[in-house]
Amino acid sequence: MPKIISKRKFNILRKTKEEIFSQIVYTKKRNGLHKAAKEYYFKDKDFTIIEDQQDRPDKPEELDTPDIPKPPKPPKGPDQPEEPGQPGGPDDPNSGNKKMPKPDEFVTHRQLQEFKKDLLVELHEIFPTKPELKRVEEKVDVLFELQKAQGEQIRIQGEQIKELKVEQKAQGETLQLILQTLQKMNDRLDKIEGKMDKMESRMDKMETRLDKLESK
């Protein structure tokens, strides 16, 4: 007989196991209506699973514990009033009404333990644990320190670039002064060369006059 599980467990199983195939196997009658059920086969599973529309079975599973007879309750007399919160007690809202509502569904201890395990698995998948949060915080701290160091390095590089710009500006001004000085020296040399040319022409004239005087 295939095992019938709840939708929640079925969804968890579909996420964790590989589904091979599925088929409609039978119809079940509920409230006078026939409804199709679906049988699923999963990998690494030695049983099949039928998708059920109810989250809990109609009947509780039988426990393996032996039946322990309960001691009979003593009759409640006027000297022994009912306990608060119990049927017939002072805090009972249904006091005076002997008919108590019965629950529609029952859950065994085994089903409750399975529900707790499945809930822990879901919470572990959704929410991180304390060690994982600690590792994330450590990574964030490392990234923060790295960003801080990079910011300091960028600030130092910016100051160095600013100093280099100031130095380049000073070097440019010095080079401009040197070029101006060289230009002035070239102008002076040109003037001196012009004066020397004039002196040479005068000396040439004086030599020609001396030659004429000597020839006479």
Swiss-Prot record:
UniProt lists compositionally biased (Low complexity) regions at 83-93
Q: Looking at the record's lineage, which domain of life comes first?
A: Bacteria
**Basic and acidic residues bias: where?**
47-62
Q: Where is the composition biased (Pro residues)?
A: 68-78
- Region annotated Disordered sits at 47-104, 194-216
Checking Pfam families in the record gives: DUF16 (PF01519)
Q: Which InterPro entries is this protein grouped with?
A: DUF16 (IPR002862)
SUPFAM superfamilies in the cross-refs: MPN010-like
Family, similarity comment: Belongs to the UPF0134 family.
What is the recorded name of this protein?
UPF0134 protein MPN_344
